[in-house]
Amino acid sequence: MTFHETATRLWKSLPPDERLLAATAFFRDPSPELAGSALSALVKARRLRPQAARALPPDAQARILATVLDPGESLAQGLLVDLHLAERRPLLAAFLDALGLPHDEGVLTEETEPPAPVSPEAARDAVAALGSFPRDQVETYLNTLWLQDEERWAALSEV
């Protein structure tokens, strides 16, 4: 599987409806660390004053942000994570269950030791367990995981 090497490239590759789902999820509960970047992207995209962008309802903010193809690397990463946490928890849970990794509704639980990289065999088996999910969603999820920790998830690029 060929992965996009940056979150921004992955974000650009998503269809508009997927970007809207991600932006809507983001604005439901915006991360304080990324809220400023998101508002800056809105200001730039629509040439708005910052206070006007802040005053928009969340659904309008989401519609605008979904059209921004280069929101910046950290914001793109946050949007991708929000897409999966809001809309695709069953996919996340199925993947982590197949790997035997502890999680809470698809979110890895804190580990006391640094995580070991996933073996190519385990990655192949876990991806095979996701056969009931849409292929494009699986590929986006795997690419997002890989972007978060390339060393741990290196085997995913070989699947």
Language-model-derived ranges and their functions:
Residues A7-L10, S74, A129, A155:
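Short, solvent-exposed coil/turn linker segments
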Residues D29-T144:
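Acidic, low-complexity, intrinsically disordered interaction modules
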Residues E151-V159:
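Short, charged, intrinsically disordered terminal tails
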